[in-house]
Structures are given as C-alpha cells and as structure tokens.
Regions:
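Exposed regions on extracellular, virion, or secretory-pathway luminal proteins
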Residues: 21, 42-43, 158-161
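Structured extramembrane domains adjacent to transmembrane segments
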Residues: 70-191
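N-terminal topogenic membrane-targeting module
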Residues: 24-95
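N-terminal short leaders/motifs
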Residues: 7-18, 48-57, 129-130
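Short amphipathic C-terminal alpha-helix that caps PH/PH-like domains
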Residues: 188-203
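N-terminal signal-anchor transmembrane alpha helix of single-pass membrane proteins
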Residues: 1-41
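Intrinsically disordered, low-complexity regions
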Residues: 22, 36-39, 46, 66, ...
C-alpha cells in the first residue's frame, strides 16, 4: 500500500504536537508536585511563603524568615519535557533538574566561601568563588583567603544530601545553594539552610 507524502507529513505533525502537549502536561504536573514539596519543607523550617509562580518547566517560591535568611527565593528549573529528543540530549550532556536557593542574611560575612560537590558540573565554575581550593570530604572548599575552619559535622551532614553547591558571601545574594532535584530534596534543603549559620559564623 502506497502512502503519499501529505499523509506522512500530517502524521508527523500530529505526533510532534501530541509529544509537545504531553510534555507540557507532564512538566506542569512535575512543577506542581515539586512546589508542594518545597512549600511543605519551607513551612516546616519556619519560613513564611509569600508568593509562588509555576509553568511547565519552572517554579518560583519566595518568602522570608528561613533560618538565617531574612528574604529568600527558591527556583525550580526542569529540563523541558515538550521535546523528548531535546530532553534526552540535555540528560546526556549532564544537565539536571535543579532547585536553586538564593537569600539574604541580616549580618553578611566579611569574606566568602563555597562548597562544590566533587565530580559534578558545579566544580567547573570553582574559580568564580575564589583562588584557594581545599578538599573537605565530598566537596571542594573554595575561598578568597585561608579556608574557614568548618565543623566536621556540617560537612558530614551535607555529604549525605543531593547538594551540589552551597556558597555564603558578602555580596547580595549572600547565600546560594544548588540542589539536584530528587527524593532527597527536603533533607538537602533543610541541611543547606541549617549549614548557613555555621558557615557564616566560621567566616566571622
């Protein structure tokens, strides 16, 4: 049986459209689910959630009073699901679904430090955080001056999470945290928030 070109073209258009629609629906469900998880852990940590925004590939939650953070925002960045080939290519290239926390503290430190998980894309930008590099457990500690003396328990707690980067610095935003989205999201975010105070004190 012969199939003319117009039929093939129509079938391709229908398939691509269906893929885009399905990808957008799946993406929106994912962001809705992650947003609910985030709001739950943020409120459990005593934060006041002020606003939320969502789309099929991102979500933004902002508020105040999160541990040491006076003001904060949490951005969820998902790899777009609308184009399955693009999604697979992004995964093969090492890109991940991420949760990114930024915030300000009342008393910023006089110098900065960043913890970057070894063996992840986070270490590619290590030099932007400082010139001094030291290894501490599963992380590289990058600072401008001599490395701060961090409590070993802080490093140990962070090591068991999906935290990729945690930075505390004098400039706004004072705190950065990048977390790989997964089953450890809640414990990772909680550990990062609790570590901020210890890191800031070590930098004083």
């Amino acid at each position: 049986m012969q199939v003319d070109e117009s039929t093939v073209l129509l079938a391709l258009i229908v398939a691509i459209t269906a893929s885009i629609v399905a990808g957008n629906v799946l993406g929106r469900r994912k962001t809705d689910s992650v947003t609910l998880r985030l709001i739950g852990v943020l409120r459990r940590l005593g934060a006041e959630v002020k606003a939320t925004r969502r789309s099929s590939s991102m979500a933004l939650v902002s508020g105040r009073g999160l541990g040491e953070l006076e003001e904060f925002s949490v951005l969820v960045g998902l790899l777009p699901r609308a184009n399955i080939l693009g999604y697979l290519a992004a995964r093969l290239a090492g890109r991940r679904d991420l949760v990114m926390l930024r915030g300000s503290v009342k008393k910023p430190p006089k110098r900065g430090v960043a913890l970057l998980r070894k063996g992840t894309p986070a270490v590619r930008g290590a030099r932007r955080w400082g010139q001094k590099v030291a290894e501490v457990g599963e992380f590289l500690m990058v600072s401008e001056g001599s490395p701060p003396d961090l409590d070993r328990e802080v490093i140990k707690t962070l090591s068991g999470t999906s935290l990729l980067l945690l930075a505390v610095r004098p400039e706004l935003p004072h705190v950065y945290a990048y977390i790989e989205l997964g089953p450890k999201l809640e414990t990772s975010l909680e550990a990062a928030v609790r570590a901020v105070e210890a890191i800031r004190n070590a930098l004083s």
